[in-house]
Design a protein with these regions (language model features):
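Catalytic phosphate/metal-binding cores of nucleic-acid and nucleotide-processing enzymes, i.e., regions
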Residues: 2-87
């Protein structure tokens, strides 16, 4: 099975933390069947309204999913996945 590329929205304050290397995980509804080895491109939105796109350096980076956790205290239908920058 080929690795999927997911384009997912992220608020600007969280984008800053990912871009700075402080946030190396995402908590997401698992409606896309995230898998280890999949890729993530982030689409950054303003914090204030969450509707407008931001020209943020994170939008030019790609991340690989390194680990996916579901169950074990994670709400049904959600997952936490680890990410590392690849470009």
């Amino acid at each position: 099975m080929m690795n999927q590329l997911h384009r997912i929205k992220i608020r600007e304050s969280f984008a800053d933390a990912v871009y700075g290397g402080d946030k190396t995980f995402e908590v997401r509804k698992n409606d896309r069947c995230y898998q280890k080895g999949d890729y993530v491109d982030f689409v950054v939105l303003y914090d204030s309204d969450g509707c407008e796109y931001v020209d943020h350096p994170l939008s030019k980076k790609r991340y690989e999913i390194t680990y996916v956790l579901s169950g074990w205290g994670i709400e049904d239908g959600y997952c936490v996945f680890g990410i590392k920058q690849v470009t």
